């Protein structure tokens, strides 16, 4: 468990030039939000929905990052700064970097899209500040989403998504 934490801290440190030590990374709200999410997701998967939402609520209050307990998150997610929202059916791969004020939002279930309402981010995706990725779309591996982009269609592998 300690080795996994050190690996996670190193993955964040490799993507952020600001921290001088792993100790600094331990203070990042994004790290705490992901940690609380892991607990909330476990409770959610065990059908303890109220407790899952309670942990989620506590995490949101402490970190200004809202990750629904139902969201599926891979290894080494780095949320750099707060005010990020990740919806219930969102799926995030490994080594994804999300900057501040990002929304992985859903579409209205009444629009005919059953089940999956939120985006899927594959491995090694980077999402710029203020981006809004909406609906049951896929952002493929190594894609980059520019700051303040509004993305409503699939983004191919290695592509850059900007604008509306």
Description of each model-found segment:
Residues 63, 68-69, 74-75, 80-82, ...:
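Left-handed beta-helix
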């Amino acid at each position: 468990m300690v080795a996994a934490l050190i690996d996670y801290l190193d993955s964040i440190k490799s993507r952020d030039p600001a921290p001088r030590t792993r100790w600094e990374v331990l203070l990042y709200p994004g790290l705490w939000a992901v940690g609380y999410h892991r607990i909330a997701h476990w409770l959610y998967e065990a059908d303890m929905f109220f407790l899952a939402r309670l942990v989620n609520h506590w995490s949101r209050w402490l970190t200004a990052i809202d990750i629904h307990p139902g969201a599926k998150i891979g290894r080494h997610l780095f949320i750099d700064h707060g005010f990020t929202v990740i919806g219930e059916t969102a799926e995030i791969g490994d080594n994804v970097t999300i900057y501040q004020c990002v929304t992985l939002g859903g579409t209205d279930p009444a629009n005919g899209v059953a089940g999956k309402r939120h985006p899927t981010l594959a491995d090694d995706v980077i999402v710029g500040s203020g981006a809004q990725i909406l609906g049951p779309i896929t952002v493929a591996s190594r894609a980059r989403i520019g700051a303040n982009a509004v993305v409503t269609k699939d983004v191919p592998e290695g592509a850059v998504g900007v604008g509306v």
